[in-house]
Amino acid sequence: MRVSCIVGRLRSCLLIIGLAASAVTPREALAATPAGGDIVGAIRDSTNAAPLPNAEVGVTQGGRIIANASADQFGHFVVHGVPAGSYIVQVRLIGYKPDSQTVKIADGSRINMTFQLVASATQLEQLTVTAEAPIAVDTRSGNQVYKQNDYHGAPSNTTSQILQQSIAGAARAPTGEVHIRGQHAEYQYYVDGVPVPSGISGSLNELFDPSVVDRIEFQTGGWDAEFGNKNAAVVDVRTRIPTGGFHMNLDGYGGSNSTDGQGINMSDNIGKWGFFLSGSRQETGMRQEPVLFDTATLKPINFHNSGQDYFTFGKAQFAPSDRDVFDFEGNYSHTHFLVPFDSANGITNDHQNEVNSFANLGWRHRFGNLDSTSASSGELFTGFYYRHGSLAYVPNVDDEPGFFFFPDTTTPYNINEQRNFDTYGTKVDFQWRVNHALEFKTGVQASVTTGREDFNSTDSTGAAGPGSNSDLKGHDIGVYIQDAYTPVEWLELRTGVRYDAHVAPFAGNQHQVSPRVKLSFFPDLSNTFYVYYGRQFIPTNIEDLRAITTVSEGGDTTSTSPTLPERDDFYEVGYVHRFPAGIVWKLDGYLKNSSPGIDDNTIPGTAIVTSVNLAQVRVRGIETVIEVRPGGPLSGYVNFAINHAYGRGPVTGGFFQTDVANVPGGWFDLDHDQRISSVASLVYSKSRFFASATGIYGSGLTNGADITQPIGTGLFDFNKDIHVDPSFIVNGALGYSLLIGNTVVRPQLFVDNIFDKRYLLKGAFFSGASVGRPRTLEARVDIGI
């Protein structure tokens, strides 16, 4: 049955490929003169000719933005299909003076440009830029792009909160989690091209401080065969690149709930070497969303909820030639917090300590012609990575036991967890452009994970209960090959196939072959239309809590079943349009069928989590993005998504006392299902002053109520009786920059939940209930040297 399904999908892919290829005959492809031309450029430092990655490129005509691009790791950029005419190409990079050149495009032309940027003596250019919203849309791929320099969120905001406010279809969830397109934390970080595997299930420690980020590109669909693992979203992070001479930035903030934090980052550029170093700490009396509230007014009661976070990050970049770039990065983060609890159910003075760290080494080497997209050229990327994580959940000796291992309802237990892991891996990719129309890419990613998992329980007398103490060992391997074929400028066909193998305790060797195909049409520079199909294989973390789940289900075989990788069929169609007035609009629809699906289950009253399987998961959604950059002091963006994520059992491998899938009709909305998620942000900037406002709306996550009748499974079936009420909050910020000699001083004020709205964020379902945070104020001062 499985083989016939795969063959059927491959036939569908081949049919799409054949239809696309038949649309343009070889003679037409060779003879037709392309409409418009390409702009290809290189951006260098004027003092040492070093490449300048991440520089922002804008093509304008008559004051209107025609296209945007950014420089890659070698300082190169390309803009395809620019209509014939005269344009101004502008380049901007923090730490350098802006530069621009005039260019004239003819049909079929390919213009090569070189920019030599001059370092600025101060950061003065940051004081006079026009307003920029932090989110942009790539009109060719449809991906959203986040720029840290344009972000005006509260200093205590985490990387996860930035993801939620940046990605269309992302839902705000408790403990800083983010649910993307109805899926539960199934996203993968890539830091400067090197993958960073996910941490321990239940970890609330952020991987890195947002201040180390330069830009992030989010890919929530249309994945090439290169991308495997947890790819509900590929979070492609480019960390800050040292530019110019020595720079240092200091910041400090304080605010509501005894919140305070300090940070420092420094960078320098010495010849072909660049260095960046960052460190920060923060402390707050409200580390997580409160779990207590007045049931009549929904006013949150903040109790036993303090925490501290520490981050360090260092990066060295070496560019020995215009063909080679080496990046070495190291990151360490540590979190300690008290676990909130409801005192009505007894005292549980529990603490959680977490550590996350990674070290990456990446090398890129270019072959062939460096400054032309028409000639044969290639690129080799080799990355090595190390990932460490640990989680210690420690109950107090005086805790009142409160957890029961079903079906025993007479002996309560306290829960203790000590877990750690180490992952070693490599990623190697080779890309070869045969000519302007055809490009191939192939590669492999492999990693080995080892660790130890010590999970135990004790009753009120101190006697040991069920436990699991075992070594962990497993590995993941992924191999792929893909191509991009552009017979004419208005058509691109991307096809590929990947093979994944996942070995984890009790799961054995799980593997899959996954075909993928994306067909894109570019009628002109302002319009993009694409369709996509991809087979997905999403493995779980290499962990083992089966000994505990066996007892928690009273020996039920559903709990002893290993949690297996998620297997998906994913379909997507999208359209992107750039309007003349500086507005970009994206409309996207998607459908995902999973068998099995993956979720996670939390032990009540703790943060201890294990992955679980659902026999089937269905996700349907439509989302739209509007980016507004008309020129002048205002800019903004709107993310709006309507999404339905639901599943059916059996649910295997969790801590459930009853079968949550045993409901009328069999289907139930998942605990991370929220029908409507929307974010709207507006930024005003005039000279040295800025002000911003961001509204966040959610129609409501599940409330944990019993399902008494079959739910609606349509996209517009809101199933309000099993969801909390909708919520809408507004966050605001304002600041002013002062120039004192060569030093920039920027005082800023941030207010989250300006109108102090009271609402339930989520009810108890797969995990506990949480209430929304009350109004908070934070004041921050940045000093840039």
Q: Model segments located where?
A:
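Periplasmic N-terminal accessory/gating domains of Gram-negative outer-membrane beta-barrel systems
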Residues: 64, 96-97, 104-116, 125-185, ...
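Flexible loop and strand-edge segments within Gram-negative outer membrane beta-barrel domains
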Residues: 284, 303-305, 323-373, 380, ...
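Conserved C-terminal beta-signal and adjacent last beta-strands/turns
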Residues: 319, 668-785
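Membrane-embedded beta-barrel scaffold of Gram-negative outer-membrane proteins
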Residues: 377-397, 522, 529-530, 534, ...
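Periplasm-facing N-terminal accessory domains of Gram-negative outer-membrane beta-barrel systems
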Residues: 24-137, 152, 171, 193, ...
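Transmembrane beta-barrel wall of Gram-negative outer-membrane proteins
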Residues: 256-283, 294-336, 354-371, 434-438, ...
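Gram-negative outer-membrane beta-barrel transporters
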Residues: 590-593, 613-707
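Short strand-turn segments of transmembrane beta-barrel domains in outer membranes
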Residues: 204-206, 215-223, 234, 238-268, ...
